[in-house]
């Protein structure tokens, strides 16, 4: 990923979606971009994978302007549904959004991602982050667009999450592994004679 200009973080933030309101923001952006601009059928855009994925929402001065989705597989993560409102294209918000997504993927210990991009956008993606077209994979089409598959190498994270993590760290909200979670504040010592439910 090309470096994110430090001043971009004064204007943009990218966070994991954890609430229904956050998911509505994601849906609104994707509807504006994919359903309206690209005339994608609803059932193709909202394909049954949203509730088993991690979503990030990009905000510009608190206003939702972009989103992406990550799905998790055994050996790789899959980068999907990157959408920016037209007014945000060509601005540094995309790099803020991708950096946040790549940080989560790296922290989980993944070394690579796959992306399925519209072939016409290959020049944009090849300039935005280090990736390569996957050789031997033929183009494919849906919703009236030609797609290609790309591989994105993810650098090793020095604090990747492991099997031996502190139990509280891995029950914290997605992407907030270094911040004490609600369950840590609810810890009560067992009372004499108490039994597990």
Which positions does each model-derived feature cover?
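Short active-site oxyanion
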Residues: 54, 109-113
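A conserved beta-strand-loop-helix scaffold within acyl/acetyltransferase catalytic domains
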Residues: 16-19, 23-88
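Terminal substrate-recognition subdomain of acyl/acetyltransferases
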Residues: 1-15, 106-107, 116-197
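A generic structural signal for beta-strand entry/edge sites
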Residues: 74-76, 112, 145-147
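Conserved acetyl-CoA-binding loop-helix of GNAT-fold acetyltransferases
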Residues: 84, 89-103
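Polyanion-binding and phosphate-handling cores
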Residues: 43, 49, 58-60, 68, ...
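Conserved hydrophobic beta-strand within the GNAT/NAT acetyltransferase core sheet
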Residues: 79, 113-117
């Amino acid at each position: 990923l090309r470096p994110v200009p430090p001043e971009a973080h004064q204007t943009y933030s990218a966070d994991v979606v954890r609430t229904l309101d956050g998911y509505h923001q994601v849906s609104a952006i994707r509807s504006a971009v994919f359903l309206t601009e690209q005339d994608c059928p609803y059932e193709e855009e909202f394909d049954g994978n949203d509730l088993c994925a991690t979503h990030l929402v990009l905000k510009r001065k608190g206003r939702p302007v972009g989103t992406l989705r990550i799905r998790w597989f055994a050996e790789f993560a899959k980068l999907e549904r990157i959408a920016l409102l037209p007014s945000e294209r060509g601005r540094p918000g995309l790099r803020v959004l991708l950096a946040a997504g790549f940080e989560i993927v790296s922290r989980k210990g993944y070394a690579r991602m796959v992306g399925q991009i519209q072939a016409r956008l290959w020049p944009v993606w090849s300039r935005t982050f280090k990736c390569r077209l996957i050789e031997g994979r033929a183009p494919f089409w849906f919703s009236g667009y030609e797609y290609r598959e790309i591989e994105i190498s993810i650098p090793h994270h020095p604090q990747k999450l492991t099997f031996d993590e502190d139990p509280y760290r891995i029950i914290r909200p997605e992407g907030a592994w270094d911040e004490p979670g609600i369950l840590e504040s609810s810890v009560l010592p067992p009372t004499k004679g108490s039994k597990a439910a």
